[in-house]
Amino acid sequence: MSTNLSNAEILNNLLEGRDLDELTSRALMQRWLNDEISDVETGAFLSALRAKSSTGVELSSMAKELLNVCELPVARPNLYLVDTCGTGGDGANTFNISTAVAFVAASCGVKIAKHGNKSASGKVGSADVLLNLGLNLNCSLEKVINAVSEIGITFLFAPVWHKSLIKLAPLRKTLGIRTVFNQLGPLVNPLRPNAQVLGVASEDLLQPMGSALLNLGMNRAIVVHGSGGLDEASLQGKNKLVFIENGELRFSEINISDFNHENIANENLVVSDLDSNEEILKSVLNGSGQKSHMDVVALNVSLVLWAAGIEDNLNEGFNKALFSINKGDPWKKFLLLKNYLSAN
């Protein structure tokens, strides 16, 4: 994959607001991976892409290059896999909803391959809270992959699988802005899931992320931007959705009031630190949590059940999720995964 354009020419196109085609987007990512772009150029590229806004073609093309260099140590399980990884970065400091969603969905029969990382901009990322709960993220990659067949859920810690991007981390941190790599994270799950629910922190990302998932061959997916700016479906009001199905994008909205529940402000979902995040996550999974916490998780699980093809009716999916939560099945699923990853 190559292009005759120099780094300077590609950068100039971006600065003039021109979108990159697939060939150029893939070539740009290859140059990053091959250390053919300096730190100064990287800062300029990331800033220019941010200012222009990345397209679905740019995102999916770069994601393909990242996936091409991500080799699996064992064969991918022949299962219909679903991911709940989003962009993060909404700055709302809510408890880690997508992680709770993953375990609840798994307890409802969805095969979950959860891709995640440490915090993007909030206080706690999925890896942070799972590490605090004692999940072993340093076991063999073979065991990580096999867990989805044995337990029905696994967690893929992004830095372990995408080591080529570690060298960019200090520069991204120095820039202090959200970049295209925040958007690429949810698109580069090494197990290449068949379906996904992908939360975005900005409404402007709904269409490009939906198009990217479509370009990557996703069977079914939902991109969601929550009321009040969450990168999850929110209890606060109208949530914007893009459904990906049959090769098409369909825009829609849902409100918790559609499920005969009252709207609740996002402030009720805020946590102050890692320990309180852990406490809330555990209480949701074992069925002893606050109603608002369990409801917001169930709402998002209903989207996962749709993506998995288990329940097309979101209201029914919501009730199915609450039933599983109230039985404490998600916590049992977490303990099974914890024990499996810790065993010799």
From Swiss-Prot:
Keyword field: Amino-acid biosynthesis, Aromatic amino acid biosynthesis, Glycosyltransferase, Magnesium, Metal-binding, Transferase, Tryptophan biosynthesis
Instruction: State the EC number(s).
Output: 2.4.2.18
BP terms from Gene Ontology: L-tryptophan biosynthetic process
Statement: the UniProt record of this protein carries the keyword Transferase: yes
Could you say which residues bind Mg(2+) 1 here?
A: 98, 232
Q: Identify the residues that bind anthranilate 2.
A: 172
Name the residues that bind anthranilate 1.
86, 117
Q: Which domain of life is it from?
A: Bacteria
Q: What does this protein do?
A: Catalyzes the transfer of the phosphoribosyl group of 5-phosphorylribose-1-pyrophosphate (PRPP) to anthranilate to yield N-(5'-phosphoribosyl)-anthranilate (PRA).
Instruction: Indicate what this protein is called per its UniProt record.
Output: Anthranilate phosphoribosyltransferase
What organism does the record attribute this protein to? Prochlorococcus marinus (strain MIT 9301)
